[in-house]
Amino acid sequence: MMSISEATVDSMIKDLPLPSNILKTLRDDVIKAGVSKKEMEEIIERVMEEYTVSCIEPCDAAGVVAAQSIGEPGTQMTMRTFHYAGVAEINVTLGLPRLIEIVDARKIPSTPMMTIALSKEHPEDYAYDREKTRALAWEIEATKIDHIADVTTDLSQMKLIIDLHEKAMEGRNITIDRVKEKFNEELNVLVSISPDIDNQIVITPGEPSYRELLQLAKSIHNVTLKGIEGIKRVVVRKEGEEYTLYTEGSALREVLQFEGVDRTRTSTNNINEIYEVLGIEAARNAIIKEATDTLREQGLTVDIRHIMLVADLMTSDGEVKQIGRHGISGEKASVFARAAFEVTVNHLLDAGMRGYVDQLQGVTENIIVGQPIRMGTGDVHLISRKAEKVVEVPPEIETAEEIEVEEG
């Protein structure tokens, strides 16, 4: 049996009315299997049959089915807010609270987190080198003064005395000059390195007042000496043969600039941040992935097409919109549909004042006015044909009723 060439495969499948991902999978599989032309024809016929069967029926209520298919498993989800997702010290919101965050398109999730994949093209790359990975983690994690020093308030001298820990500074690869420079930039006060005591910095407020000193004592704890503002903690974890970084806090744009970060595999659970940095298509994929992972973690399986429909709706206008009165539901064309969701009186009054006309195209508005909904059999118009010729019964033929009367 002679297998067909790649060119023949391409010519046989190029005009098939199938999605591109199915065509790609079909092409790769048949080339790998080395099928004959007859087998290829049978495979195409079978694939077309399966695809036709899997397509949704005309007039099906896809939106209602998707809502039910996601909502029903949602009732079985736990209310756990925090969970150590296999990583020490990194808390992540899961379960129902996380699903609500996703469909509400929250600007900032309650527990922002990043998964930073590292480059692994060569054996000496970051993904395989623990020392390089650890050094990168210190570059990304925000270093505050609390991490490397003890701060003492000297009320008699009206000064702040900072005693730096040499070992902590070595671990985070930060110098005393860097600390001094950062405080000078951020606080605009007199910062000096103690000439008598090693690793000691003295900060004097602009005005020698008790209030200024206390204010300064608060301010120095907010200065980021090194790393990215907002990344509170970075944890290194070995998965298989390679190292991965997990962060508490998210800063996708800044993290992608670092050498050693794999930009194609690094992600965050902040969907709005993905939209701002990578665009709307990436945000759509993030919604699908986050919702699917959240449901799967709870042991629930939902057909991905239901989630894809929700993600498509949330991103169809080129920006991420919530499913709520400030998003999808609040922007429906139908006045009745908007009124049925929330703030009913306001919607009806506003529509009456502006003279809006409702075309009654959707499900909700037709139910409100008592009409059949335009779904399923309600969206099909039947026309009965009249008989072309009406057969008349001759008067001489007696009916059964007349015969019974005569016999009686």
From Swiss-Prot:
GO cellular component: cytoplasm; DNA-directed RNA polymerase complex
Pfam families given in the database record: RNA_pol_Rpb1_5
Chief localisation class: cytoplasm
Keyword Iron on entry: no
Subcellular localization(s) per the UniProt record: Cytoplasm
Biological process according to GO: DNA-templated transcription
Keywords attached to this entry: Cytoplasm, DNA-binding, DNA-directed RNA polymerase, Nucleotidyltransferase, Transcription, Transferase
Gene Ontology molecular functions: DNA binding; DNA-directed RNA polymerase activity
Catalytic activities: RNA(n) + a ribonucleoside 5'-triphosphate = RNA(n+1) + diphosphate
Entry keyword DNA-binding: yes
Enzyme Commission code: 2.7.7.6
Function as written in the Swiss-Prot or TrEMBL entry: DNA-dependent RNA polymerase (RNAP) catalyzes the transcription of DNA into RNA using the four ribonucleoside triphosphates as substrates. Forms part of the jaw domain.
Quaternary assembly: Part of the RNA polymerase complex.
Protein family per UniProt: Belongs to the RNA polymerase beta' chain family.
Full protein name: DNA-directed RNA polymerase subunit Rpo1C
Gene, per the UniProt record: rpo1C
